Amino acid sequence: MSDNAQLSGLCDRFRGFYPVVIDVETAGFNAKTDALLEIAAITLKMDEQGWLMPDMTLHFHVEPFAGANLQPEALAFNGIDPSNPLRGAVSEYEALHAIFKMVRKGIKDSGCSRAIMVAHNATFDHSFMMAAAERASLKRNPFHPFVTFDTAALSGLALGQTVLSKACLAAGMEFDGEKAHSALYDTERTAVLFCEIVNRWKRLGGWPLPLPTDK
């Protein structure tokens, strides 16, 4: 077995980071003051040949925290009615506690050391998740406090597109605009897109890295 064959595990691929795809829907742009309304998380796994694929999924509608701003423009954009009882919304604590529990198990099972968020325009999703975790006083946050994998940047490099829908189409994937701005759908599409970019780099010979040769 070559040394390169040892690099097919998830723990080897991203320096021990465990990638978790996240998307949020919110009632504005300010993570400190505007409500988190929906969040979805998809973990990733690798098969024995080192191909990346989606694994486990969690999805929650979230109750606005006490005193949260609800910007009408944001609600019109994502079509969410925070007061609709049919949403089955849970607290920020309940949503993130469940997601963090799933992620910590994935970290342990894969031999990774810490989770890293994968998201499209990741700064936005990261800021809202971290602010919600702080409000919920969740101490065991498995995610890196600032490092992310941004599929907008990766798509710009690999596909020449930065908009999620256009990047998916450029990658040969389907994208239903009617389902966009649902956290679950956008997370699923982002997960498949990230896996395609990582796997395409592998197919092109970019991974595993070539072994250094002595001259």
Swiss-Prot record:
Catalytic residue positions: 181 (proton donor/acceptor)
Molecular function via GO: 3'-5' exonuclease activity; magnesium ion binding; nucleic acid binding; RNA exonuclease activity, producing 5'-phosphomonoesters
InterPro entries linked to this entry: Exonuclease_RNaseT/DNA_pol3 (IPR013520), RNase_T (IPR005987), RNaseH-like_sf (IPR012337), RNaseH_sf (IPR036397)
Site label Important for substrate binding and specificity, positions: 29, 77, 124, 146
Cofactor(s) needed for function: Mg(2+)
Protein residues bound to Mg(2+) 2: 23, 25, 181, 186
Co-factor note (free text): Binds two Mg(2+) per subunit. The active form of the enzyme binds two Mg(2+) ions in its active site. The first Mg(2+) forms only one salt bridge with the protein.
Domain Exonuclease: 20-194
SUPFAM superfamilies associated with the record: Ribonuclease H-like
Keywords annotated in UniProt: Exonuclease, Hydrolase, Magnesium, Metal-binding, Nuclease, tRNA processing
tRNA processing listed as a keyword: yes
Positions annotated to bind Mg(2+) 1: 23
GO process annotations (BP): DNA replication proofreading; tRNA processing
Pfam families: RNase_T
Similarity-based family: Belongs to the RNase T family.
Physiological role: Trims short 3' overhangs of a variety of RNA species, leaving a one or two nucleotide 3' overhang. Responsible for the end-turnover of tRNA: specifically removes the terminal AMP residue from uncharged tRNA (tRNA-C-C-A). Also appears to be involved in tRNA biosynthesis.
Subunit structure: Homodimer.
Matches recorded under HAMAP family: RNase_T
The name this protein goes by in its record: Ribonuclease T
Annotated source species: Salmonella typhimurium (strain LT2 / SGSC1412 / ATCC 700720)
Gene name, Swiss-Prot/TrEMBL: rnt
